[in-house]
């Protein structure tokens, strides 16, 4: 079991280092993919933030606070939001460690955007809000070729449908 960013996982699959990997879709055209889930990207705020009670967080307000950026390598969903809406956030810290970001947000050092799946059952005292614009990632399983996959991978694929 290996942990890496999307680019690393794509390389591992292509090189045969791993049989399959969880990736953001779409991915490389030469991979077979199985869509698993759409995961909303949520704004994460300290509990005492002025917008903690809003129904949906205004995307333009992302530039109003110091921002903790979850990013490593290419294909970063959060940076794509900023590019799409022509925003320049006040990025104070960039890391790939989502728990470090939640701790900094809880301490009032800024705000962030994190995937909703990461925010389930967390010990941090933070507030998660949907953006007022669509923001999500599609998660899927990718592999080179199902027909030549290992027996273990084929059995794993059967369990995905449960």
What are these regions (language model features)?
Residues 1-29, 88, 95:
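Central regulatory/effector-binding core of bacterial HTH transcription factors
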Residues 5, 58, 96-97, 115:
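Short loop/turn segments at beta->alpha junctions
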Residues 10, 14, 33, 59, ...:
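Short hydrophobic/charged patches on amphipathic alpha-helices used for structural packing
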Residues 29-35, 39-40, 54, 99-148:
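Beta-alpha-beta core module
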Residues 30-41, 45-67, 151-153:
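Flexible hinge/capping segments at coil-to-helix
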Residues 60, 138, 142-162:
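Extended ligand-binding regions for polar small-molecule ligands
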Residues 65-85, 149-157:
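Secondary-structure junction motif
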């Amino acid at each position: 079991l290996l942990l890496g960013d999307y680019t690393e996982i794509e390389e591992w699959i292509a090189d045969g280092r791993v049989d399959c990997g969880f990736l953001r879709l779409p991915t490389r055209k030469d991979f077979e993919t199985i869509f698993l889930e759409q995961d909303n990207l949520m704004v994460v705020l300290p509990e005492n933030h002025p917008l903690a009670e809003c129904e949906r967080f205004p995307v333009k307000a992302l530039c109003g606070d110091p921002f903790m950026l979850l990013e490593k390598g290419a294909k970063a969903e959060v940076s794509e939001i900023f590019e799409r809406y022509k925003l320049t956030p006040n990025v104070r810290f960039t890391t790939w460690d989502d728990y470090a970001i939640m701790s900094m947000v809880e301490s009032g050092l800024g705000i962030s955007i994190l995937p909703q799946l990461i925010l389930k059952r967390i010990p941090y005292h933070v507030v998660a809000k949907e953006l007022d614009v669509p923001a999500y990632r599609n998660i899927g399983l990718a592999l080179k070729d199902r027909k030549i996959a290992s027996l273990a991978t084929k059995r794993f694929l059967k369990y995905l449908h449960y």
